[in-house]
Design a protein with these regions (language model features):
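Conserved helicase motor core of P-loop NTPases
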Residues: 137-290, 301
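C-terminal accessory regions
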Residues: 184, 282, 294-414
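Conserved RecA-like ASCE P-loop NTPase motor core of nucleic-acid helicases/translocases
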Residues: 27-69, 134, 199-206, 218-243, ...
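Conserved helicase motor core of SF1/SF2 NTP-dependent helicases
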Residues: 23, 43, 47-53, 59-71, ...
């Protein structure tokens, strides 16, 4: 059952947005954290379901789909599952000849959807089905080709609802208010941070000191002060994979303190990683046979040297990997900000240094900061943070989508 959303309690900006959505077949809803995207989507679903409209919900990743299920109370699927992918061929069963049976399709985290996947999704929609695309255009674009959400907005061919009002409860969060400052190109407010604040900057200039401070924060200070599990609840997000502050080096350092090697503990070394019971791991590619997807995070539950298998617990599911399949997972004490898209974590820690210079961009830092729910800690150099906040010139992608939208979409959506 959809979560209750009384339209009488909507803010004026949300009520105007609701009229726009209900009056158009295709609509984009965009906005940052705390601006009421979830409330608006729930209102749309409540009204249309009350009228007997069948609504389907989807998102590009498993974790994003799970979050959508939690916030709406309705089942949400990954786009691949919704389109009924055939694991053997990689093709979708749902297409223009076998369309989805729904009157409305809601797509969350649309900024993560690339051009080919969006093309497949639109092909599977019946002609009269409504489409609501929800996302934050200021986040990182998809890993795959194109900038679907940004191009749709820039094209001007579909109505765009821009939610900008940060509501009172969200405005109490320094994570949210500072995320919006960064989105506007302003440095976050770090003056005399209250110890009880949910946003902190710990200044360290030397990379070795950044690592030492980060490890102590993750392993001791954050779990003690905020009563969080250092493995399950605290996530380190890195701008890059390589270097002393990259994913690989930090995973090695964090594994040593979070889940140290024990002689009596079975373990396996494959593809540059050592896996043992209790390790936090991430799926690095879609595996439709196993029903696990790129970005899913789990905990190693069993290492069986006889069967040559590792079992990983992803939420309620136990997934088994042959030793030869362990290139599908890697340690996840630290992951890239790109890999974190579509996910939220109770506590997020982000190292920042000028050695990340080529990747220090506003949308990268903004995306990382908005992953934290209860606590966000930046560790490193203020200069690096300043570079990122000022750098609003991400590499332009030329997929041809924008021109196609401008030329063709008016006729297609008429």
């Amino acid at each position: 059952m959809v979560r209750a959303a009384d339209t009488e309690t909507l803010a004026p900006s949300q009520r105007e947005a609701l009229k726009t959505v209900l009056g158009n077949r295709v609509v984009v809803i965009t906005g940052g954290p705390g601006v009421g995207k979830t409330t608006l989507v729930n209102s749309i679903l409540m009204i249309l379901r009350a009228k007997g409209v069948k609504c389907l919900l989807c998102a590009p990743t498993g974790r994003a789909a799970k979050r959508l299920t939690e916030t709406t109370g309705l089942e949400a699927k990954t786009i691949h599952r919704l389109l009924e992918i055939d694991p053997a061929t990689g093709r979708f069963s749902r297409n223009e000849s076998n369309t989805l049976a729904c009157g409305l399709l809601v797509v969350d985290e649309t900024s993560m959807v690339d051009v080919p996947l969006m093309h497949s999704l639109v092909r599977a929609l019946p002609n009269r089905t409504g489409l609501v695309l929800v996302g934050d255009v200021d986040q990182l674009p998809s890993v795959g080709p194109g900038t679907v959400l940004g191009d749709l907005i820039e094209s001007g061919v579909v109505p765009v609802v821009r939610l900008t009002e940060v509501f009172r409860q969200a405005a109490d969060s320094h994570i949210i208010t500072n995320a919006h400052r960064i989105r506007r190109g302003q440095m976050p407010d770090m003056r005399g941070a209250d110890p009880s604040s949910d946003f902190h900057f710990v200044e360290r200039d030397d990379p070795e000191k950044i690592v030492a401070t980060l490890v102590k924060l993750v392993q001791e200070r954050i779990p003690e002060r905020f009563r969080l599990d250092p493995i399950r609840d605290v996530q380190v997000l890195c701008p890059m994979n390589r270097g002393s502050l990259g994913v690989r080096e930090l995973n090695t350092a964090l594994q040593k303190v979070s889940n140290p090697t024990r002689p009596d503990q079975p373990a396996v070394e494959r593809f540059g990683w050592r896996f043992q019971i209790g390790d936090k791991v991430i799926q690095t590619e879609n595996d439709y046979d196993k029903d696990v997807f790129n970005g899913d995070v789990g905990i190693v539950e069993r290492v069986d040297s006889v069967e040559q298998q590792v079992a990983v617990r992803f939420d309620e599911r136990l997934v088994k990997y042959d030793f030869g399949e362990l290139d599908e997972i890697s340690l996840a004490y630290a992951i890239t900000i790109h890999k974190s898209q579509g996910s939220e974590f109770p506590a997020v820690v982000i190292p920042l240094a000028t050695q990340h210079y080529m990747l220090l961009q506003r949308n990268l830092i903004y995306t990382g900061i908005t992953r934290g729910k209860r606590l966000l800690v930046l560790i490193g150099q203020k200069k690096a943070l300043g570079i990122a906040v000022r750098n609003d010139r991400p590499q332009r992608r030329y997929s041809g989508l924008l021109n196609s939208l401008r030329n063709d979409t008016r006729k297609t959506l008429a």
